[in-house]
Structures are given as structure tokens and as C-alpha cells.
């Protein structure tokens, strides 16, 4: 039976999940996780406590409880459960109060709510990424923070959306297709924004697998075509001195982190 894990918050529970996943990923084990957001009252906290206690009675193992709860009275209810408690906010707040010489002033949902100035940056960036996905339009490239390039199915769209959703970065993306390969060059709109360009590439064998799952037995998905496109695009990156990374076997989170590290782009939100 898998060890039970609870991610609990009086907000979205995103913080509890992120920290919890980061900690648990250090162990070569699988877990049975349950996320419970918006535990905003003592009554809700008591109901969650009952779930935790029932799990302990059923399994004989104390559930792992990761939480980021602002209100002390709600937090105390969770503390009193039979779970093994990991309180991220309280762990860091008390030492910081001492170092900064000021008492914390907790605010509900401050880290993810609409009151956060980064909220508008997130929405604007998501809208921009969707409107400027896959070269749909070249009219607004000047407004981009970043323009991702690459062959079809190398990870441009998920990377653009992740950067916009997670960091508020306006990321457009432009595809190089089979028709471009005979005379591969940068369109004028991209030349004008050369400092914003960043290339993605991928191992041809992996690209072949991805395309084959969508359009099997086509020229588009053939290994020969994949090898040719990747080779041509990488040569263009080198000729134009466009930085690029290989996305093969990397998660979208890892790709985004590499892009930010190489480009030095600043996050617009946290």
C-alpha cells in the first residue's frame, strides 16, 4: 500500500504541492497523494483532520501532511491530527521575522490571488502566448519577451505556455516547416527581433516517434525527414548565432529553466 500524502492549504494549495513534490522527489518511492485547497474555516479543517485520522487508523501509518496555512487557528487543527506535519510557511516565517526585525502580516491568498500584481502579468502573457502560437501572426513580435523557434513537434507550444503561466513571460513561437527547408532563413519580423530569438531542437529519432504517433507512414513523420529538418535548423541556429537547447527527454519545467538561465530573462511574477 502506498504511503498517503496530504497537500493542504487555505488557498490554492499550489505552494504546498510544489514544496511537497520537491521534497518527496528525493525518495525512490510512489505515494498516494490528495490535494485539499481552500480549507478556510475551522469546520473544514476539522473535516480534513478526520480524513487524516481515518487514514492513520486504516493503514497504521501516519500520513505525510504538507501544508501552507496562514490562519493560526486553522493550522492548529491540522497540527492536532495524527499526520506527520510539514508546515512550510511557519518553518520559514519565524526565522525571517528575527532576521528582518519585523513581524509578518499574513494575508490570505497573497501569494496567488488577484491582489498580487503578477496576476495581470500572468493573464496578459497567457493571452499573448496563445495569440502568437505557431506563427499564427507576425504582427506582434515586437511585444514579445522571447520568441521560440524550432521544427514542428519539438516542444515550442508547451514551453511558451509554461513560461507565460508560470513566470508571466510573453513568449511567442515560430515553426520551421518542410516548405522552409529548401531556403531556410529568418523572416523579416524575426530578424528585427533577433535578440529575443531562442531555438529548440530535438533528437531526430525522438521527433520521429512523436510525429509517427500523430501521422504514421507519412513523409512528415519519416526518420529521414526528421533528420533533415533538425540538421537544417541547427545549422541555421549556428549561422545566425541563435542560442538553443535540445528538448529530448527533458520536461517542460526543465526546458523553461534552461531558457531562463541562458537568456537571463527575468520572471515577471512569482
UniProtKB/Swiss-Prot annotation:
MF GO annotations: ADP binding; ATP binding; phosphotransferase activity, phosphate group as acceptor; protein serine/threonine kinase activity
Q: Keyword NADP, does the record have it?
A: no
User: What catalytic reaction does the record list?
Assistant: [pyruvate, water dikinase] + ADP = [pyruvate, water dikinase]-phosphate + AMP + H(+); [pyruvate, water dikinase]-phosphate + phosphate + H(+) = [pyruvate, water dikinase] + diphosphate
Q: Which domain of life is it from?
A: Bacteria
Q: What class of enzyme is it?
A: transferase
The answer to keyword Manganese applying to this record is no
EC number assigned by the record = 2.7.11.33, 2.7.4.28
Which residues of this UniProt protein bind ADP? 150-157
Any idea which UniProt keywords this protein has? Kinase, Nucleotide-binding, Serine/threonine-protein kinase, Transferase
Instruction: Describe the function of this protein.
Output: Bifunctional serine/threonine kinase and phosphorylase involved in the regulation of the phosphoenolpyruvate synthase (PEPS) by catalyzing its phosphorylation/dephosphorylation.
Alphabetized HAMAP family for the sequence: PSRP
Kindly provide the name given to this protein in its UniProt entry. Putative phosphoenolpyruvate synthase regulatory protein
